[in-house]
């Protein structure tokens, strides 16, 4: 088997923690390489194509691009930085020969940095460390380098991996340098580092064709697009191939078009060589991990390893009285087809049918992972109901065990006591407390169960007035210490009739608690309209107006002033509900409701539970 290297090709991924600037870095690499032509419009965060990505400032789906710099073609994959989307990260690492590990010059390595770096080390990849945001006030690059070295040691890095090259950048300003004291006004030092320290791919030009599907895309005209790196040989358009999963021959097919990345475009080519990352069309029902190979030399590549889901939710057809009034897709078949389509692309997601034909079990890597899916479906016109997230338990060595997570909280000092108390209530363990160099903020390192984290993100944001930073990643499984985690949530106010809420009635209810609705809001019997001041649920009438009389008032009526209702976001709703409640999601509304809408049904259920 003749082995060579393609000296003018580099395959590299960019991995980093959320909001450490990797997407902006890719923008600048594309811009300064000359890959964009003069007539092409440039916008910031060009690699984030998903609306949710731009709104939240995070990367959810891995993106592929390539730049031509001098004689070198550099394939770049911008990967997610959040562990909930780690399924994307793992597949990407199977396609590249090096990674740019982007770390904030002030914050240093964070939990997701640890997560993706550990994955990279497991593939034997040597990283190029990029200390980004070097222009930040109070940047501390030397401290960050020490933190990265300690992290690598803890992850059992080899001597070669510990001898990592470092480049300093400000992606925002488009500058880089091998020393933070001597910065170039461009990205040339970073281009040079990529070419110098990324090994050119090993190629087998004379072997039969073989590649593995690491990503899937879809085009309305081209259909399913399979993306992967050619492991051996070469491929031409219209070539006959076999599609296999592990060692089982599945079927034969024919490749349609071969597409190569350049900038933000896919360019059609007639032939692609070993080592390159390409996209192919013409093959239906492709799956992640499928091996595409020469029919005469069938050989499957090892299946890609993906961490298992840790959280599950039930997705159901919307059965509320307002069902079908706001959405376009409302049937169980439409919801199931959409979920199965998502499962094809979203490899960390698992869909199962249940005994109820209108309900499906959806499991993923965390609350954020599933809430992104729900939000996307909502924007596409779907109506559905979802349950409270439940942690997936495992039986290991005849013991029931639950997933544990490493959590890092970055908070202002004044909130430290409150947050530490909350962590204790959720059975978490604080392993380290680190004040920052200005003694204004504190970093808390904790180990806490995934079960305890459900709803904590929203509570944490409220307790820190939005100023706290929250990071988490899966750590390990361990025996359940306590079956019950105390939830300090009051009871709820439940509407007893269907109609439009009246301001006069809501005004009188304000003394009972905080409301989710305002005057004129349509409500139905069994809908949750507010939070009760006490721990019990209370059924209320929010439709009654002021009694009319035939007597003229001696003075003017008092003006009714309603307090601003609590803003209902998807994350808040999912974390707020109890097991006997559901979140109703439509393109226009997010409502909370009881599973049983009739008050007498709820009373019977409560009585049976007590007995």
Swiss-Prot record:
Keywords: Cytoplasm, GTP-binding, Hydrolase, Nucleotide-binding, Ribosome biogenesis, RNA-binding, rRNA-binding, tRNA-binding
Name of the protein in its database record: Large ribosomal subunit assembly factor BipA
Cellular component, GO annotation: cytosol; ribonucleoprotein complex
Catalytic activity: GTP + H2O = GDP + phosphate + H(+)
Protein location: Cytoplasm
Similarity field: Belongs to the TRAFAC class translation factor GTPase superfamily. Classic translation factor GTPase family. BipA subfamily.
Molecular function as annotated in GO: GTP binding; GTPase activity; guanosine tetraphosphate binding; ribosome binding; rRNA binding; tRNA binding
Subunit structure: Monomer.
Domain tr-type G: 7-202
Binding site for GTP: 19-24, 132-135
Lineage: Bacteria, Pseudomonadati, Pseudomonadota, Gammaproteobacteria, Enterobacterales
Keyword tRNA-binding: yes
């Amino acid at each position: 088997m003749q082995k060579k290297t393609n000296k003018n090709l580099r395959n590299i991924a960019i991995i980093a923690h959320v909001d450490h600037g990797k997407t902006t870095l890719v923008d600048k690499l594309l811009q300064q390489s000359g890959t964009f032509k003069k007539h092409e419009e440039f916008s910031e965060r060009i690699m984030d194509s998903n609306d949710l990505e731009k709104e939240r400032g995070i990367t959810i789906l891995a993106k592929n691009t390539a730049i031509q710099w001098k004689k070198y073609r550099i394939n770049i994959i911008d990967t997610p930085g959040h562990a909930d989307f780690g399924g994307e990260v793992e597949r990407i690492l199977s396609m590249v020969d090096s990674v740019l590990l982007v770390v904030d010059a002030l914050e240093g390595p964070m939990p997701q940095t640890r997560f993706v770096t550990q994955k990279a080390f497991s593939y034997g990849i040597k990283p190029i460390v990029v200390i980004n945001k070097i222009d930040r006030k109070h940047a501390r690059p030397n401290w960050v380098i020490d933190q990265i070295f300690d992290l690598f040691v803890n992850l059992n890095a080899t001597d070669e991996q510990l001898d990592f090259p470092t480049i300093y950048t400000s992606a925002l300003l488009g500058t880089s340098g091998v020393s933070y004291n001597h910065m170039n006004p461009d990205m040339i030092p970073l281009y040079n580092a990529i070419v110098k320290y990324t090994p050119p791919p090993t190629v087998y030009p004379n072997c039969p064709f073989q590649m593995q599907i690491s990503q899937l895309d879809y085009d309305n005209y081209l259909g399913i697009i399979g993306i992967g790196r050619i492991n051996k040989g070469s491929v031409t358009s219209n070539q006959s191939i076999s599609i296999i999963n592990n060692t089982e021959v599945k079927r034969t097919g024919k490749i349609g078009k071969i597409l190569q990345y350049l900038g933000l475009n896919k360019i059609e080519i007639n032939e692609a060589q070993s080592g390159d990352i390409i996209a192919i069309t013409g093959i239906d029902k492709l799956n992640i991990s499928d091996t595409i190979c020469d029919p005469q030399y069938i050989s499957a590549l090892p299946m890609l390893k993906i961490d298992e889901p840790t959280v599950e939710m039930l997705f159901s057809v919307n059965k509320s009285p307002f069902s079908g009034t706001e959405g376009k897709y409302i049937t169980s078949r439409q919801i199931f087809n959409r979920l199965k389509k998502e499962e094809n692309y979203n490899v960390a997601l698992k869909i199962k049918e249940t005994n109820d034909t209108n309900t499906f079990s959806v499991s993923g890597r965390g609350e954020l992972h599933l809430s992104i899916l729900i939000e996307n479906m909502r924007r596409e016109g779907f109506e559905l109901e979802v349950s409270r997230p439940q942690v997936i338990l495992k039986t290991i060595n005849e013991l029931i065990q639950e997933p544990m997570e490493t959590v890092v909280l970055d908070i202002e000092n004044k909130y430290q006591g409150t947050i530490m108390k909350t962590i204790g209530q959720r059975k978490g363990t604080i392993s380290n407390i680190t004040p920052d160099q200005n003694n204004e903020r504190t970093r808390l390192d904790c180990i806490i169960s995934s079960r305890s984290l459900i709803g904590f993100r929203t509570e944490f944001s409220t307790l820190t007035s939005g100023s706290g930073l929250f990071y988490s990643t899966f750590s390990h499984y361990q025996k359940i210490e306590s079956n019950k985690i105390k939830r300090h949530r009051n009871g709820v106010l439940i509407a007893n009739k269907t109609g439009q809420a009246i301001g006069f009635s809501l005004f009188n209810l304000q003394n009972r608690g905080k409301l989710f609705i305002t005057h004129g809001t349509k409500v139905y019997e069994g809908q949750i309209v507010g939070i009760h001041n006490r721990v019990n649920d209370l059924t209320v009438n929010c439709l009654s107006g002021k009694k009319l009389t035939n007597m003229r008032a001696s003075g003017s009526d008092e003006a009714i002033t309603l307090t601003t209702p609590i803003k209902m976001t998807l994350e808040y709703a999912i974390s707020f509900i109890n097991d006997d409640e559901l979140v109703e999601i439509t393109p226009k509304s997010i409502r909370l409701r009881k599973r049983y809408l009739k008050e007498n049904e709820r009373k019977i259920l409560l009585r049976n539970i007590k007995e």
